Amino acid sequence: MSQPRPLLSPPETEEQLLAQAQQLSGYTLGELAALAGLVTPENLKRDKGWIGVLLEIWLGASAGSKPEQDFAALGVELKTIPVDSLGRPLETTFVCVAPLTGNSGVTWETSHVRHKLKRVLWIPVEGERSIPLAQRRVGSPLLWSPNEEEDRQLREDWEELMDMIVLGQVERITARHGEYLQIRPKAANAKALTEAIGARGERILTLPRGFYLKKNFTSALLARHFLIQ
């Protein structure tokens, strides 16, 4: 069997994207890095986004860190998901930065969260720390859109969390709020502050926040599609 090659330009169809992702299944991160001419770091402490960058190179992703989807022409977002030996997610999944100001008139339909989750290419990757990074294998990809029930669940959480932000309660939001979608601080250090609205409607400085999918949501999603018991 011939070795796969990284896509040099963005895929033109979902079928092409999925076919390329399927070719990567079973390869280790070290093998894919070597084939792409990259060095595999010893661990992810200083290169937290390295796996995502590696797979973006292989799949011809275009967006980088821009707010649009990774495959903008197709409207598809790429999400790598570290899993254990049973295929269960090991951590929450970052969706996008949570807007803390300028939220008047924003609805679920026009929200950044929904835009990012409209169509997702999930790629599970072995994530247990006992496996050296270079030896972790890439799993079978899944091209997913939320069904009616998933959309409703996410919408309810998003509306609850956005209400708290708009009403000046951002400092009271914990990771326990929201059944499937949560908001958590997202900052490399505690000095990176951003503007938000305080309890009396005043401007305050707080840590930037991000929207994350909880493990119970992604676990059920993967289990349903891969028939994990």
From Swiss-Prot:
Q: Where in the cell is it found?
A: Cytoplasm
Major location category of this protein: cytoplasm
Looking up InterPro entries in the UniProt record yields: DNA_mismatch_repair_MutH (IPR004230), DNA_rep_MutH/RE_typeII_Sau3AI (IPR011337), DNA_rep_MutH/T2_RE_sf (IPR037057), Restrct_endonuc-II-like (IPR011335)
Matches recorded under Pfam families: MutH
Q: Which UniProt keywords are present, listed alphabetically?
A: Cytoplasm, DNA damage, DNA repair, Endonuclease, Hydrolase, Nuclease
Q: Does the keyword Membrane apply?
A: no
Annotated Gene3D superfamilies: DNA mismatch repair MutH/Restriction endonuclease, type II (3.40.600.10)
| UniProt record, GO biological process | DNA modification; mismatch repair
GO CC, any one term: cytoplasm
Query: SMART domains under this entry?
Result: MutH
Q: Mention one GO molecular function.
A: DNA binding
Source domain of life: Bacteria
The protein's job, in short, is: Sequence-specific endonuclease that cleaves unmethylated GATC sequences. It is involved in DNA mismatch repair.
Give the family this protein belongs to, as stated in its UniProt record: Belongs to the MutH family.
* Name of this protein: DNA mismatch repair protein MutH
